[in-house]
Amino acid sequence: IKDAVAKAKAPESLVFGVVDQTPENRRPTLASLCGPAKLRYVHVSPIETRGVCWARSVAFSLYQGEDFLLQIDSHMLFEQDWDAQLIAQWTALKATCDKPILSTYPYGFEFEEGQPVVKINISDQTTLVLRPHPETALADDNATLRFRAEHVFTRTPVPGCHVAGGFLFTEGRFVDEIPYDPRLYFHGEEQSLAVRAYTHG
């Protein structure tokens, strides 16, 4: 939250919907990180939780008609003016697609001396695209495909068949049109979202 607010071009326009599944209620701490942004917060004891999809369905219930949705995992770093960049990319795609979704698996990072460090060389000539993982095959005991992010030498948008639950940016109405299935625990989450998003345009 702190990084998102610090690097946003318009932090006052941000609304965070947080479903906190830790033992202690951290609303005051998280609210103090929000600055001019708003916080909608639900605390659930880890004993009472039912998995990531259930938590994300609860997070979707915090939606109040905002223009855009950015769904991320809690382990995330942001680029400067990330909010304006996402809106600009989405707006450009809107000219060719009625309901564009920007989605990928973001770079991982590590902490060194208390500071986050991305150890991958980031190129301004490639786009990070979701592709099926080569070590994945459908089987009777495993009906879930795995995907990974790969660099493609283009800076133009690449159509995809998959969405990443840990980074998904689109119109806010996605919340109402493609609600989360709270009965899924983890596997199948992204395939369910991708198929339903496709069939809804």
Model features per residue range: what roles?
Residues 1-201:
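Catalytic cores of eukaryotic secretory-pathway lumenal/extracellular enzymes that build
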